[in-house]
Amino acid sequence: MQSWSDTALPSVPGQGPPLRLYDTADRQVRPVTPGKKATMYVCGITPYDATHLGHAATYLTFDLVNRIWRDAGHDVHYVQNVTDVDDPLFERANRDGEDWIVLGIRETALFREDMEALRVLPPKDYIGAVESVNEVVELVEKFVASGAAYIVDDAEFPDVYFRADATEQFGYESGYDRATMEKFFAERGGDPDRVGKRNPLDALVWRAERPGEPSWPSPFGPGRPGWHIECAAIALNRIGSGFDVQGGGSDLIFPHHEFSAAHAESATGDRRFARHYVHTGMIGLDGEKMSKSRGNLVFVSKLRGEGVDPAAIRLGLLSGHYRQDRAWTDQVLEDAQSRLKVWREAAALDSAPSATDTVARLRQHLADDLDTPKALDALDGWARRAIEGGGSDTQAPGEFADAVDALLGISLR
C-alpha cells in the first residue's frame, strides 16, 4: 500500500539526551535504547471514519519519537498497518450502501492527505491487512499445529481461536486482572459468549466465511483474519520480534496489543514482542469523550476545509502531554493559533537572543517522556524575548525555526 510523501528535516546543531518513555508493561518511564536502526510499529486506522483528532494525536505522538530518533542519527524503520478488512468497515459500508473496498480506499486516501498536511513523517512500510492475509494464514497454521489455537466444533462456521493461556506471560502488558480483561474484551471487539470457545478470553484468529463477507482460502477453510493477528503478522514479517517501540492509543492496550503480543510470542518463543509498549491518552471534546457512538468526532479534514492551518491543529494537540486524556476545545485551537503567530513572528526577525540554550531545553524536555508542555513553554519564552527586541544573534531566528521544524514538525517559514 502506498504511503504519503516524506519531507526532509533540517539539520540542528548539537545532540539531545537519550529518549525515555513510559512503558505500559513495566509501569515506569525508562530509556529507549535502539541500535543504529530504530524500529517502531504503530497500529493504523480502520478506514471508515478518518481522520479524527484522536487518530491525529496518536500519530503525532509517534511522529515525535521518529523525529527524535532521526535527530539522534538513527535509521528509523517505521511500520504502520491499515485494518482494511474488519467488521466496522463492513458495517459502515452496509449502512451507507457502499462497497467496502471503495469506502476503505477513499478513507485511506483521506488519511494520507491529513497526515501529509499535519507533516507526519510517513512509515517505511504502510501495510494493509488485505495484503498480509497469506502471512496471517501461515501464523494460524503454526498455532493450530502447536496447539496454541483450535477450530471450534461448528459445522457451519468453524472459526479458529487462539488460546489465552497459550503463553505463560499473557497479561503482562496490560497488568489487568481477569475481571477487567473480560470487561474490556466484551467492549472492544471480543466475543466472550461464542459457543464452542474453551475460554471466554480466547481470541479469534481466523473467521470462517460468512454470507456477504469477503474471504480468502486457507487450510482451515475460506475466511478472513481476526484483528489482533494482523498486527502480529505484519510486524513480525517486517521488523521481527523484539523491536523497539509498539505504539497506539490507550484503548488498544487490551485486548488488541495484549493479544498481538501473545500471538507473536507464541510464534517465536520470545518472552516479549516489543521492548517498549507506549500508549497515548484519549482526546475529548468540550469535556466529553470523543467517540463514534456520541457523534462528536472532530475531523482533521473538516478543520482544514474550514481554513484552519494544519500547523495550528498539530500545535494544539501537542500542547497537552501525550499520556493524558485531554480535551479539544475552541480555546485549545485559539491558543495554538496565537502561539503559532508569535513563533512565526519571532522566526522572521533579523536578529534575536541566542537560541542555543532554548534548543537544548527543547531536546531535553522531548527526551523526557515527550514532555511537550514544557518544551512549548521553553519556546514561548525565547519567542517573547526575541520579539521584545533583545539579542543580536543573526543566526538565532533560523536556528529556532529549524529546531521547531525538525523536532516538532511545525514549519515557521
Swiss-Prot record:
Q: Which domain of life is it from?
A: Bacteria
Q: Which function does this protein serve? A: Catalyzes the ATP-dependent condensation of GlcN-Ins and L-cysteine to form L-Cys-GlcN-Ins.
Query: Which reaction equation describes what this protein catalyses?
Result: 1D-myo-inositol 2-amino-2-deoxy-alpha-D-glucopyranoside + L-cysteine + ATP = 1D-myo-inositol 2-(L-cysteinylamino)-2-deoxy-alpha-D-glucopyranoside + AMP + diphosphate + H(+)
Give the residue ranges for region: Disordered. 1-21
Q: Some GO term, biological process aspect, for this entry: which one?
A: mycothiol biosynthetic process
Recorded hits in CDD domains, A to Z, give:
Anticodon_Ia_Cys_like (cd07955), CysRS_core (cd00672)
Query: Which cofactors are named for this entry?
Result: Zn(2+)
Q: Which residues bind Zn(2+)?
A: 43, 231, 256
| Name of the featured protein | L-cysteine:1D-myo-inositol 2-amino-2-deoxy-alpha-D-glucopyranoside ligase
- Tell me which GO cellular component terms the UniProt record holds: cytosol
Query: Motif 'KMSKS' region at which residues?
Result: 289-293
Entry keyword set? ATP-binding, Ligase, Metal-binding, Nucleotide-binding, Zinc
Report the EC code(s) recorded for this entry: 6.3.1.13
Q: Where does L-cysteinyl-5'-AMP bind?
A: 43-46, 58, 81-83, 227, 249-251, 283
Q: Where is this motif: 'ERGGDP' region?
A: 187-192
Checking InterPro entries in the record gives: Cys-tRNA/MSH_ligase (IPR024909), Mycothiol_ligase_MshC (IPR017812), Rossmann-like_a/b/a_fold (IPR014729), tRNA-synt_1_cat_dom (IPR032678)
Name the enzyme's class.
Answer: ligase
Subunit info?
Monomer.
From the record, which residues define motif 'HIGH' region?
A: 45-55
Regarding protein family, the annotation reads:
Belongs to the class-I aminoacyl-tRNA synthetase family. MshC subfamily.
The terms under GO molecular function for this entry are: ATP binding; cysteine-glucosaminylinositol ligase activity; cysteine-tRNA ligase activity; zinc ion binding
How is the cofactor bound here? Answer: Binds 1 zinc ion per subunit.
* A Pfam family per the record: tRNA-synt_1e
